[in-house]
Amino acid sequence: MGLLDFLKSKKNTAETAKNRLQIIIAQERNHRGGPDYLPLMQRELLEVIKKYVNIDADAVRVDLVKDGEHDVLDITVALPEDGDK
């Protein structure tokens, strides 16, 4: 059974990698099709948040998501656990 479990785990790993790549591709497509102001908005949000909390540049993510007839601006900010500046 050890060999079968080993082969099965590779399938799960391959499936996980495939799912991750699909997510990355979908995000890249969203960024290409999104408005030109999104990267600037992301940088400006980062600068404002940095005034209050010490965060990295990759901690702020701005995405435009289509939800039926509406476009939804999805802003994700990963804050540090300590919350100190």
Curated annotation (Swiss-Prot):
One of its GO terms (biological process) is regulation of division septum assembly. Disulfide bonds: none annotated. Transmembrane segments: none annotated. InterPro entries: MinE, MinE_sf. GO terms for cellular component: plasma membrane. Pfam families: MinE. Keywords: Cell cycle, Cell division. Signal peptide: none annotated. The keyword Cell cycle applies. The keyword Cell cycle applies. Prevents the cell division inhibition by proteins MinC and MinD at internal division sites while permitting inhibition at polar sites. This ensures cell division at the proper site by restricting the formation of a division septum at the midpoint of the long axis of the cell. Belongs to the MinE family. This is Cell division topological specificity factor.
